[in-house]
């Protein structure tokens, strides 16, 4: 790694679901903000139970991926749209304060829930999360789209997410890259692949965010991010990413394969994303 890492500043809530003004300004300036103590122990325990169900049920789901590297003692597991089949995730999305936090950080009056995405890196897995940005995968257009990423475990620097600060304001676009190194997306446009920002020359700044259970990160749909494998010997790195759509977002009928592949019901290019698959919550 050629780039030095800097630690993101973190912020406490003024009251439940209401971050301070400087936290919202950090999100708008840097493309990411770290918020401490966003969710109670009860919500984290509920999500942990839901993840156990998702992993045990994974062989029945075409949305679930289990990536293992020969010689590694652990695996990298991820799945999506759990809220549609596992009650613990549905309760979290619709009953916790997660939607309020997303709306407040984005300064959005309305809010649509896009989808949930769980990631589990077992101890000893070398599988990395490649550099990417979320918008490249999605049939959406607009700025008020965020990823609200919740830690279920203590996440030290060794396993923490990395972000290219301010990259959400860069104009250049890149193709999506599959998290499974043996898989590829179909019909991608003729644009460059995402560089490896750990070694890419330039004056960009890479920040990391150590976390405790119940902390969250909120980042923009164009913020470049990645994560290392889990080199810890005894601790998993479990996280839930929830994705939220605000006031200025419309459906973008992209020609290439998107991830998740679901396009909702009756959506029209340039129109609202609201439908049964992507429900309005505010």
Please report, for each region that a protein language model flagged, where it lies by residue.
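Active-site region of the double-stranded beta-helix
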Residues: 108-109, 135, 151-161, 166-168
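Double-stranded beta-helix
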Residues: 157-224
């Amino acid at each position: 790694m050629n780039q030095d890492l800097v630690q993101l500043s973190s912020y406490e809530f003024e009251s439940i679901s209401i971050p301070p003004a400087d936290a919202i300004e950090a999100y708008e300036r840097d493309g990411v903000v770290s918020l401490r103590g966003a969710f109670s122990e009860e919500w984290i325990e509920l999500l942990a139970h839901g993840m156990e169900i998702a992993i045990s049920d994974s062989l029945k789901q075409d949305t679930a991926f289990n990536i293992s590297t020969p010689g590694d003692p652990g695996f990298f597991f991820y799945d999506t749209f759990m809220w549609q089949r596992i009650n613990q995730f549905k309760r979290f999305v619709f009953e916790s304060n997660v939607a309020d936090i997303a709306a407040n950080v984005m300064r959005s009056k309305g809010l649509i829930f896009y989808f949930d995405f769980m990631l589990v890196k077992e101890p000893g897995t070398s599988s990395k999360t490649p550099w990417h940005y979320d918008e490249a995968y999605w049939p959406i257009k607009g700025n008020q789209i965020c990823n609200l990423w919740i830690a279920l475990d203590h996440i030290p620097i060794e396993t923490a997410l990395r972000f290219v600060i301010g990259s959400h304001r860069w104009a250049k676009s890149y193709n999506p890259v599959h998290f499974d190194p043996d898989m590829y997306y179909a019909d991608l446009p003729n644009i460059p692949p995402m560089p490896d920002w750990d070694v890419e020359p330039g004056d960009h700044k890479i920040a990391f965010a150590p976390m405790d259970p119940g902390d969250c990160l909120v980042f923009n749909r164009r913020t470049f991010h990645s994560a290392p494998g889990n080199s810890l010997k005894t601790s998993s790195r479990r996280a839930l990413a929830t994705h939220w759509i605000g006031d200025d977002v419309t459906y973008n009928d992209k020609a290439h394969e998107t991830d998740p592949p679901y396009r909702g019901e009756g959506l029209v290019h340039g129109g609202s994303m609201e439908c049964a698959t992507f429900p309005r919550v505010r």
